Amino acid sequence: MIDVTSLSAYDLSQKLHSGEISSLDLCKAYLDRIKKFEKDVQAWQFLDKKLLLEKAEEADTYRKSGKPLGPLHGMPVAIKDIIGTYDMPTECGTVFRKKMSNSQDSEIVNLLKNSGAIIMGKTVTVSYTHLTLPTKA
């Protein structure tokens, strides 16, 4: 059995579209990998496993409907915690935004979702990454 977590996005997209792998199985494989390494890596700021698996099942059901699919249909994608989402906290790596979310998704999240991607969650970012500060010349 091939380790799907080692495949490129292109290869995963091909396997998802052909039905060789399901979105649910792919998401479960990623969750297993996260469980294995998260204690040491501490990469995730927000990850709702139950919601991820629900969205994966929805993607698989939609795929079976025969309706047109986006190029990233059923593909799990992680985003940094500075990218705004309405259904997940966007804390920007600071306690001042603890559990705050946006009123709408950012443009990149809209593009990903419209392409069929599943937003897995938010990865950790450095505090105030979103700010631009002057530099010395």
Please place each PLM-identified region on the residue numbering.
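Short alpha-helical functional segments enriched in proximate histidine and acidic residues
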Residues: 33, 37, 55, 59, ...
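Short, solvent-exposed turn/loop segments enriched in Gly/Ser/Thr/Pro and often Arg
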Residues: 123-128
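An N-terminal boundary/leader segment
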Residues: 1-54
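Single conserved hydrophobic/aromatic residue that forms the stacking wall/gate
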Residues: 130-137
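Flexible, acidic active-site loops/lids enriched in D/E/S/T/G that coordinate Mg2+ and/or position polar
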Residues: 49-72, 79, 98, 102, ...
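Enzymes and membrane/adaptor proteins characterized by extended Gly/Ser/Thr/Asp/Glu-rich
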Residues: 39, 71-111
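General beta-strand structural signal in soluble alpha/beta enzymes
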Residues: 79, 119-122
